[in-house]
Amino acid sequence: MSALQEIPSPISNMQTSNFAHVIFQNVAKSYLPNAPLECHYTLTQYIHPHPKDWVGIFKVGWSTPRDYFTFLWSLMPEKYVAESTCNCVLTFQGYYLPNDDGEFYQFCYVTHKGEIRGASTPFQFRASSPVDELLTMEDEGHSDMLVVTTKTGLLELKIEKTMKEKEELVKITTVLEKEVLQLREHVEGLESEFLREQKRSEQLSSEREELFNASEILRNESDEAKRKCKEMSAKIIQLEEDIMLVTQKAIAKETELDSLKDKLKKVVLEKDQLECQLKYEKDEKDLYKVHLKNTEIENTKLLTEVQTLKNLDTNKENLISHYKEELGKLQICLADKEKMNKELLQNSSNKEDIAFLKQQLRKLEDQHQASRQEVSLMSRELSEAVNKRDKTMADLHSARLDTDSVRMQLADALAQLSMRDEQQQKSNPFAKKDQGADNNRVEQELRKEVEDLKLRLQMAADHYKDKFKECQKLQKQVVKLTEQLKATENQQKERELFCATEAAAVTVMKQCTPPVSPFTSDSLPEFDIREQVREMSLEMAEKTEKYRKCKQMLAEEKARCSAYADDVAKMELKWKEQLKVNDSIKRQLIALDDQYKVQSAEKDREICDLSYSIETLRNEKAKMERFINDLEKKLEKQAGWAASNTQGLQFFNPYCDEHRLAPAIPAQQPLLQFGNPYASQETRDGADGAFNPDEVQGPPVRATSWGLEDKVVCSQPARNLSRPDGLEDPDENNAGLITKDEDDDDDDDNVNFEQTPDPTRIAMHDQSGFCFEAGYTMNKKCPLCPVSFPPNYDQGQFEAHVESHWKVCPMCNEQFPPDCDQQIFERHVQTHFDGSVLNFD
């Protein structure tokens, strides 16, 4: 027992709600032990059946699903729908059932997982006995005696009662049919009497006054409606004028769009031109790079040459100092010679030669100083050229960076322009055909401009190549001249050394030898000096010419470099200006695009609002016109009716309290025929689940409609707040139908109400809606088509037929009259997909 207590019961762990997932139906209190047993149960939506589920018979007090007595597999129901209820039946064979042991059993539904999802009320298996077939019931004579009968006898008595009730009901129906025929005959008699009776002049006069008052009210309403129509027409005209203005503005905006598109095309063409210019500038930059490399090489050569020239200048200065010393010595010698000449009284010709030699020496000194100054100037010019070269290199590097940045900006601008072009093509797919001719023309013009630019660039490249070749030739000439200068300087040095040695030798000879006659010893050195002076003058002249030529070449090279630098600066300025212009044009285009989009969106909204307002005004105008026509028709009908002193057919309402008959059978609420299977056991009579005579009832006797219904109200589905267009007034509808039946079907069994026009009914015209009067029993006719329906036709189907004539919007369920224009209806449906907001006020 302790082990059994420790094992937890599965029933305690399961939720109590799981037992209600399968409901067992019609479970009796007892069953025969050896007879087949049918088990009826319902699968709710909370359980999913499985082929391995089973239904077992358990003894009351079971603890686990294994404590079953017998079981059957629960078959899968046919045409099972998930999450829906399903009724099933299983039949247990008699030889599997327990015997009459006095124990209580119950049905349990067990899933394939071993979970119990349903349990029935307890029952027993008991053998049949004659006492079970007996029932006790009270005597019908209202005595205190109890009568014992069998079930079969009780059922036979009930069947006899139901048959008698059926016969009585048949008799009642025949009587009612006869009464209906009598009432119809009576109604026909009343109609004939009503046609004959025309003596109610007082009633007619009062009705005339009421009609006149109603006609005046209707006239006032018609005047107001006409005034409203005039106002609406004026509003429509104003709206049409506004639409014309809006269309004109839209056309102007379209022209602006076309101009903007042309500007865009021009900008794209300029962009292509700039790309071509960039390509050509790249080529020029490459050429400039090559030229810079060559100029750098030449500059290095020139620097080396300048250094050599500086060395030569130092050597020349040394030589000049040496020559000065020698000149001083020569002057001393000349002074000695002059003294000697004075002493010897030489001829005046010798004096003139000495003066000439002095002048030549002075000239040589001046030329030497001039050459030194020219060398210093050349060095300065070379330094300036080097500085300019450095500046040009820096400018070229900055220009390269600028071109790279411009290239990136152009790429971004191209991407943006391509995106805008795609967007414009998507937004305006129909504008491509119109722009084809303009595009071709613009492309031809752009091609011509590109060809012209190519020719110009080719000419500039050829010119640059020629200039580059000239620069190379000049550089070669400069190299040759520097080499010649070096050779001449070397020769001059050698000659100066030779002259210095000869002068030193002459001075030594003069110092050593005594003075002799002037024509023998002094004439030779003077002649040599003259020859040396002539040679030096010639060399100096050649050097000055070479310096002059070099100077001219350097000046030309500087001019060319400055011209190239100016060209590069101009190109950079032009490029920057073009970039600024492109940026400004892009910004303007972006601003114009945004403005145009905003304006176009606003105009579209205005157009949609105006079109919708025009449609509403037209609908209102149509409503007012129809309302005025209806009022005029009513006035004409009432005036004619009053003039002829005739009145519509009157008849009594057979459904009122005065003419209503008492019901033949009192109305009773139907009771449960088979009882509640889950009711308490106290209500059951006996232990075997037999039927209680109080619970066993015949079919509920339905009371006649004469006693149950006071008024018949047609249930009409809810409609829009606004009254549908083109729908006639139900009162007028009924009146029209009655008059038609009077004119066309005089022999039919139709009934007309007493028609008394009331101003309150006319005032409630707009609030009446679409419904039918309760007492209207004649044939139902569709107000929109000539189809008629019998009086007992289903009201829902009749309303569905009437609504089928109307056009219903699939998005907002707004109804349109049958004569509504299809384009207006489609435009209304399209407004739901355009993103525009509709107001249904």
From Swiss-Prot:
Q: Which residues bind Zn(2+) 2?
A: C809, C812, H828, H832
Which keywords has UniProt assigned to this entry? Apoptosis, Coiled coil, Metal-binding, Repeat, Zinc, Zinc-finger
What the entry lists under Pfam families is as follows: CALCOCO1, SKICH, Zn-C2H2_12
What GO molecular function annotation could you give as one example from this UniProt entry?
A: zinc ion binding
Q: Locate the compositionally biased regions of type Acidic residues.
A: 741-751
S-S bonds: none
The entry marks the following residues as binding Zn(2+) 1, namely C782, C785, H801, H805
Location of the region described as Disordered in the Swiss-Prot/TrEMBL record:
419-441, 678-759
* Zinc-finger ranges (UBZ1-type): 779-805, 806-832
Q: Name one GO biological process term.
A: apoptotic process
Q: Which residues form a coiled coil?
A: 173-560, 612-640
Q: Which InterPro entries match?
A: CALCOCO1-like, CALCOCO1/2_Zn_UBZ1, SKICH, UBA_autophagy_assoc_protein
User: Which residue windows does the record flag with biased composition (Basic and acidic residues)?
Assistant: 431-441
Query: What CDD domains does the record tag this protein with?
Result: Zn-C2H2_TAX1BP1_rpt1, Zn-C2H2_TAX1BP1_rpt2
Is Iron given among the entry's keywords?
Answer: no
Q: Specify whether Metal-binding is a keyword of the entry.
A: yes
Q: What's the stated role of this polypeptide?
A: May have an anti-apoptotic activity.
**What's noted about domains in the record?**
The C-terminal UBZ-type zinc fingers function as ubiquitin-binding domains.
Specify the protein name. Tax1-binding protein 1 homolog
Organism listed in the record: Xenopus tropicalis
